[in-house]
Curated annotation (Swiss-Prot):
Keyword Cytoplasm set for record: yes
Biological process terms in GO annotation: protein refolding
Protein name, as recorded: Chaperonin GroEL
PANTHER family xref list: 60 KDA HEAT SHOCK PROTEIN, MITOCHONDRIAL (PTHR45633)
Organism expressing this protein natively: Tannerella forsythia
Name of the gene encoding the protein in the UniProt record: groEL
Catalysed reaction equations from the record: ATP + H2O + a folded polypeptide = ADP + phosphate + an unfolded polypeptide
Residues annotated for ATP binding in this entry: T29, L30, G31, P32, K50, D86, G87, T88, T89, T90, G415, D495
Keywords, sorted A to Z: ATP-binding, Chaperone, Cytoplasm, Isomerase, Nucleotide-binding
PROSITE patterns: CHAPERONINS_CPN60 (PS00296)
A Pfam match: Cpn60_TCP1
GO cellular component terms, semicolon-separated: cytoplasm
GO molecular function: ATP binding; ATP-dependent protein folding chaperone; isomerase activity; unfolded protein binding
Subcellular location: Cytoplasm
Quaternary structure (record): Forms a cylinder of 14 subunits composed of two heptameric rings stacked back-to-back. Interacts with the co-chaperonin GroES.
Length: 544
């Protein structure tokens, strides 16, 4: 296909147009008084959202050059979302500001490479300043609640629920967000290890009202193959009957004949037993069985280690304070495994999370880590309509990511104040030449933009508020929700330092690439062939 090439100002102006179109659509959502954006969907009701990255991902422009500009800023939002989970609108606003002022300087004759070097120097200084302003969150639930509330657009209910979930599952725990059946938003915490396999036969049920099997202080047998013949298990089963304790069997599967024998023995009352299939598949199954074994102090009986089911001894069995099995899930509470072995296993999984490049693998490893270390909480998001539920779910996701980021790197004053407090760090900074110094000035001006946009969205004059906040110190800032100037940290208006840092780093990175662009290549639009002439109009040549 033929290509069309544009150079210099022609190229950059068209790219800038695309940047502005996308950024203007995204930045209306910034701050507590930011507006919603409605997105058309091919099927079903339109989506209403206040999430910057969701808006950005929907935008495709007709002009290929403008679209490339929009895609660059979309990349800023996506990368910020991937790394920090929030701050996508802030990153977009910063990118637009750096590109806008930078482009004017390039047009006036500044060297783009020197500008980029100056921008990078300034960003490093601002990042240092953000780190110095940061306050550790630790286990301060009030601060966690504030972060969640701000990211959920000031929704106190969501803030409280996330703080409650965090308190229960701790730092390593996993919190997932799901749609509720009703209109209430609730949190449900699963203590201990839960995996998505239920009993193989309903005849194992001990509580017929709840249709659950509940065992106190049971033994747990873990086998990685199919149990075909029950005689292999007889020595263990006989000892179970003598001890009076229950047995949970976790195996790849159980043959119908062996299962029938187990059920008959269970119904006659002599044997307290329940069988479930092993969770996961392939290598992940092996890893999960090993996790269960370490948690319960047992051993995985596997032929890979030269073990056979008939050779199983009592000391190979794990145990736990309580086991609950329903038709879908098995939950093991307070496994009696060795604490040091569990810690060592947690360390191994953390190391794997660090090294893996696959998002899917990372998610599964995180789940395994949570099951061993903290537990799993599920936030069920409810709302009167599906449209509202999806919008609320977006906000809960943002709040959750922001809270995790705050626990990692602490919090800084919110409302764009952290950026303004970094300006003094840039005052004495000079570049190696005039253009580098101009790059530093560009960043100094751009980091005022998030506060200016928050104020504009609240219907006030941005320049006036920015000047007043700059005159203050520390966490003094403008609370757009209440329309007062106050200490934002005390008022609970705080942002995660990680989100604030990553938003600026990503914005500056893409803006630097943009300013140093000299040529843009796009597919040439092919002219559609003219439709054939109607043969009945042949005698009309003399008409004017």
């Amino acid at each position: 296909m033929a290509k069309e090439i544009k150079f210099d100002m022609n190229a950059r102006d068209l790219l800038k147009k695309g940047v502005d179109e996308l950024a203007n659509a995204v930045k209306v959502t910034l701050g507590p008084k930011g507006r919603n954006v409605i997105l058309e969907k091919k099927f079903g009701a339109p989506q209403i959202t206040k999430d910057g990255v969701t808006v950005a991902k929907e935008i495709e422009l007709a002009c290929p050059y403008e679209n490339m500009g929009a895609q660059l800023v979309k990349e800023v939002a996506s990368k910020t979302n991937d790394k920090a989970g929030d701050g996508t609108t802030t990153a977009t606003v910063l990118a637009q500001a750096i590109i806008g002022v930078g482009l004017k300087n390039v047009t006036a004759g500044a060297n783009p490479m020197d500008l980029k070097r100056g921008i990078d120097k300034a960003v490093s200084k601002v990042v240092e300043s953000i780190a110095s302003q940061s306050e550790a969150v630790g286990t301060n639930m009030d601060r966690i609640e504030h972060v969640a509330k701000i990211s959920a657009n000031g929704d106190e209910g969501i803030g409280k629920l996330i703080a409650e979930a965090m308190q229960k599952v701790k730092k390593e725990g996993v919190i997932t967000v799901e749609e509720a059946k009703g209109t209430e938003t609730t949190v449900e915490v699963v203590e201990g290890m839960q995996f998505d396999r239920g009993y193989i036969s309903a005849y194992f049920v001990t509580d017929t009202e709840k249709m659950e099997t509940q065992f106190e202080n049971p033994y747990i047998l873990i086998y990685d193959k199919k149990i075909s013949v029950l005689k292999d298990l007889l020595p263990i089963l006989e000892q179970m009957v003598q001890s009076g304790r229950a047995l949970l069997i976790i195996a790849e599967d159980i043959d119908s004949e062996a299962l029938a024998t187990l059920v008959v023995n269970r119904l006659r009352g002599g044997l307290k037993v329940c069988a479930v299939k092993a969770p996961g598949f392939g290598d992940r199954r092996k890893a999960m069985l090993e996790d269960i074994a370490i948690l319960t102090g047992g051993t995985v009986i596997t032929e890979e280690k030269g073990m056979k089911l008939e050779d199983a001894k009592m000391d190979m069995l794990g145990s736990a304070d309580k086991v609950t099995v329903n038709k879908d899930n098995t939950t093991i509470v307070k496994g009696n495994g060795d604490k040091a072995a569990i810690e060592s296993r947690i360390g191994q999984i953390k190391a794997q999370i660090e090294t893996t490049t696959s998002d899917y693998d990372k998610e599964k490893l995180q789940e395994r880590l949570a099951k061993l270390a903290g537990g799993v909480a599920v936030l069920y998001v409810g709302a009167p309509s599906e449209v509202e539920m999806k919008e609320k779910k977006d906000r809960v996701d943002d709040a959750l990511h922001a809270t995790r980021a705050a626990i990692e790197e602490g919090t800084v004053p919110g409302g764009g104040v952290a950026y303004l407090r970094a300006i003094p760090a840039l005052e004495g900074l000079k570049g190696e030449n005039e253009d580098e110094t101009t790059g530093i000035e560009i960043v100094k001006r751009a980091i005022e933009e998030p506060l200016r946009q928050i104020v504009n969205n609240a219907g006030k004059e941005g320049a006036v508020v920015v000047q007043k906040v700059k005159e203050g110190t520390g966490a003094f800032g403008y609370n757009a929700r209440t329309d007062v100037y106050e200490d934002l940290s005390e008022a609970g208006v705080v942002d995660p330092a990680k989100v604030t840092r990553i938003a600026l780093e990503n914005a500056a990175s893409i803006a630097g690439m943009f300013l140093t662009t000299e040529c843009v290549v796009a597919d040439k639009k092919e002219e559609a062939p003219a439709p054939p002439m109607n043969p009945g109009m042949g005698g009309m040549g003399g008409m004017m």
